[in-house]
């Protein structure tokens, strides 16, 4: 499959062919229809994982967010099925190698949900990290009915 990836330590990202991922236990493989970009993607491409000493593997595919169609599900995955339209993100859980700027992406099942029918793939791909940040922020302050909440700097994850 084609993917934007870092082939080896010290290399710059390049578009090229890498093996298509398989679904392992607790994962979902999607055919990517759209992928979102976040500041973390540039940092990963620039070598952040190396500088932070985070375990990772090559080829290292760039990208965290995506929307697409389920191609395969691993054992233990029962909330989505082959053919479902979904959105999700790749967790930064070591060893890091998976990404979403590719024809196919393998995502942890816990980070995948069905795409609402009225939402296009491009919009859906922009939601996972930024949307999770928004939900976590609201959950953290636990607003009550009648309270006012100011959203400042809603620029995403």
Stretches with model-predicted labels:
Residues 79, 88-152:
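NAD(P)H dinucleotide-binding glycine-rich loop of Rossmann-like/cofactor-binding domains
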Residues 4, 28-29, 150:
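Conserved beta-strand elements of the Class I
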